Amino acid sequence: MKTDLVIAGYIIHQNKVLLIHHRKLNLWLPVGGHIDENETPNQALLREIKEEIGIDVEILNKSNIPAEGNIKCNLATPFYVNVHSVGDHDHCCLFYVCKAINPEQLKINNELKNFEWFAKDDLNKDHVPADVKNQSLAALKLYNNLLD
């Protein structure tokens, strides 16, 4: 089965996680998408976030090892990676924790129905898929640990 490499970012602001309501999939999900040719996962994530919701973020969990010698750049470490089915093919998804820089400028594009900032307790709503809930809780915990 064909497997695409994709990224997703759990964007945190004021101890809430942003989820988008995807129009085509009719699911509440983190912002994300495919990694294009000649693009790093970090570049893909920043691009997808800008295209889908129009804001800037800081990707957290970056390496503190100096980028010296033959190293072009350090990439953030995903907090979770999985392979899941999307019908006729699979996605290998790298999940990241992000800090919203300008959340007041958030505006969804036409791929999305809606967005919502979810507090920890709000993630128990029926419309939040179990995997997204679990990943959101892990992202919130990691975010708070990284900023302590």
Enumerate the language-model features and the residues they cover.
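Short connector loops at helix/strand junctions that flank enzyme active sites
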Residues: D4, P30, E52, G87-C93
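NUDIX/MutT-family hydrolases
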Residues: L94-K99, E104-A139
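Active-site-adjacent beta-strand/loop module that shapes the phosphate/pyrophosphate-binding cleft
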Residues: G69-E104
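Active-site beta-strand termini and strand-to-loop segments that position acidic
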Residues: I11-Q14, H22, C98-A100
